[in-house]
Amino acid sequence: MGNKQHLLSLPMAAVSNANFACGWYNNLKAFSEMNFRTSTGGRRPRKRYTSGPLMSSLLLLPEIATLNKMDLLPQVESESPFNNIIRPILNDAEWTDEISCLHNWHVINSLLKEMESQGSYANRLDYITNRIVRASETYRIINERGFQLDAKSGGSHLNAWLAAISDFRTQAGI
């Protein structure tokens, strides 16, 4: 499951419902004989940082490093005990798979607790909707500053989440 799929648990938890879905745009469902042929293997995945404010994950290199140089890191940084690895100067060698995993869980857990503290389902949906809108605004600021994020780091998933929440509100009468 990718990072965006993990973060999808936020709108789902807002209403204790599985009315939301987020996929890989059917690219993993396409059958290809090449998937079954012997290969030499792939490379290690590129290191990522889960951004609560963006509700996505960013590449450590070049995205976190560049956003830090542009003084935009505070706007995308999650509250995490592992931030000392990315600031004041990024040390990507210390950002191990274990730390990345623990950081990801920490961010998701913090967001879930914050959302659950909102009380009613309507308040939870308002909260998560506001978080998504703020994330979209932060993406807009990054784009206006002339920095293009990797397609997997971008905010294209946010509009789908807003539409799903809106549809759910309509169907549930919330």
Where does each model-flagged region fall?
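Short beta-strand/loop segments at the ligand-binding rim of alpha/beta enzyme cores
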Residues: 1
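Catalytic cores of alpha/beta
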Residues: 5-19
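Gly/Pro- and small hydrophobic-enriched strand-loop and loop-to-helix capping segments
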Residues: 18-28
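C-terminal structured domains
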Residues: 10-14, 27-94, 98-99
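C-terminal extensions of enzymes
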Residues: 76-174
